Regions:
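ATP-dependent phospho-/nucleotidyl transfer catalytic cores
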Residues: 13-101, 113-114, 142-154, 179
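Catalytic-loop signature of eukaryotic-like protein kinases
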Residues: 106-114
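A short beta-to-alpha transition loop/helix N-cap that caps and shapes the active-site region
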Residues: 12, 22, 130-134
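C-terminal catalytic region of ATP-dependent kinase domains
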Residues: 115-185
Length: 185
């Protein structure tokens, strides 16, 4: 809460800009190798070509145009985790559940072009976590159809749905959720 000379000015939060400079400074990577994608297709830094390839590995459209999860068998999961940091995605989802931000449309992902850092979700924009509406946060993230935004477009949850289709990751997620809530939250 911000008060200036005793007058209430509202609720503000300070946060760093989650851009390639931030990622380079905090993760020790070369900023010229950073790709940042938002809403599954929009390039904020670098290219989205690899992210689109990774998305198509887990979710494809059927004949009627609906998104369908392509299950990640053990072999496919091993390949998928060469590109996506599955443990980081689990931690991201746990944080989103704990800080129940109903605004899941503003998603960002990043990686380095040399894969020293695999695709990870960026946790930011948690302003709606202060609202009283909790909703079914994980239900939204595991919705293969997507979640409609205010402009009518769908925010795709492809990576999360693909990971959930794998038994090894699902077991890891549950175990990690219990551990994090017991020891950290």
């Amino acid at each position: 809460a911000v008060y200036i000379n005793g007058r209430y000015w509202g609720l503000y939060d300070l946060k760093e800009n989650m851009n390639k400079d931030y990622l380079a400074a905090h993760y020790g990577v070369d900023e010229d190798t950073v790709n940042i994608i938002k809403r599954n297709t929009v390039e904020l830094a670098g290219s989205n070509a690899d992210f689109l390839r990774v998305r198509s590995y887990v979710v494809q459209q059927n004949a009627s145009g609906a998104n369908v999860v392509v299950p990640l068998t053990a072999e496919r999961y091993a390949e998928f985790t060469k590109w996506v940091d599955a443990e980081s995605i689990a931690d991201y989802l746990i944080a989103r559940e704990y800080f129940p931000d109903a605004d899941m449309f503003n998603q960002k992902y990043w990686r380095t072009t040399d894969y020293k850092v695999r695709w990870r979700a960026i946790f930011y924009d948690s302003d709606f976590a202060l609202s009283s509406e909790r909703g079914d946060v994980l239900g939204h993230y595991f919705n293969v159809v997507g979640v409609p935004s205010a402009d009518g477009s769908l925010s795709q949850m492809d990576l999360y749905c693909g990971l959930r289709s794998n038994e090894e990751w699902s077991d890891y997620f549950i175990t990690r959720y219990i551990y994090v809530t017991k020891y950290y939250l």
